[in-house]
Amino acid sequence: KASLISSRGCPFHCHFCSIITFYAASPGKSWRGRSVANVVDEMEQLARQGGASHFEFQDDNFFVQPKRALEIAEALRARGVDFTFAFLTRADQIVKGEKYFPAFRQAGLRYVGAGLESGSQGSLDRLNKETTVEENSRALHILWGNDVAAQVDFIMFEPNTTVEDLEQNMDFIESHGLFGYFPPIILSTLALFPGTRSREEAEAAGIAFGSVHESLPYHFQNHDAARVKVLLDQSMGTFGAAWYELVIDLQDELARREAELERANGHTSQLLPLVREMKLEYSGLASLPYLLLKRILREGRQAGFEPLQAALLMQPTLFEFNAARLRVARVRDRL
């Protein structure tokens, strides 16, 4: 695997993004791309001399010019290099470039880092994403419809998040099959980087505090949303480390077992059902933080958020986590 950069900058103006500030002092356009030939020369060298067969474009936004992006992939393929690749972009650009994705998939595209950020239009507007929830939804379906995986970038909590935003995010997550996405996107919190509009707004509102040279911690404007974050963090602090370790271990083991299945040449009568069972356990474990947040939101709406106690809220989740650990151990004993 090799990482490379084919362009610099981004022509969009998200309030939370440090890219604008980073390149502000540089003369010229906000987005600058290397020539197709120059990029392909580097990729061919990495493939033939370095043995790379998968390329990850670390461009701030690889898909600013879809035609150029496709030309890069097709030009390398024309040189006889067998490879796969991945890149980062925005939801609205995926939608606008929909017609290119069948060719991208054929050229070797395997996954896209999709900057969705939110399932709440209010949050998208505050962040100045200049996209819609509908575009986020459409972008996911375009990727999945072309057998391209989506690596989802999400901002669950930002300084002005409301409980309604959180509920809309959860609705979006559930309705798009992201319930259990790992790492859990429901834990993501906006970072206030120096020079960003989001940071300036938080400082002006008097809710940001800390060193001027770092990502600032901040207080949430909405008291109920702040309480939800506290309850979620306290609950995850109790079992989160052990949970992460087990989920990652299961990911690694499933990858090994699936490789064994591929080598088994059809002799899978014993291994296949156990791997399926392990996948079910993985799915259940990965969903636990999502179930926890869903419980916090539901019970907070019913009884008020302030009286809720993390120790009581997390008991069902902790019970299921411990039960899942035992089930996983039993499956492993049978493998």
Stretches with model-predicted labels:
Residues 1-150, 158, 171:
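Radical SAM [4Fe-4S] cluster-binding motif and immediate context
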Residues 24, 175-184:
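Alpha-helix termini
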Residues 160-175:
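Catalytic cores of alpha/beta
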Residues 153:
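Short acidic/histidine-rich active-site segments
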Residues 199-202, 208-335:
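Radical SAM enzyme core and accessory elements
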Residues 12, 67, 122, 126, ...:
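Flexible glycine/acidic-rich beta-alpha junction loops that bind and position SAM and/or redox cofactors
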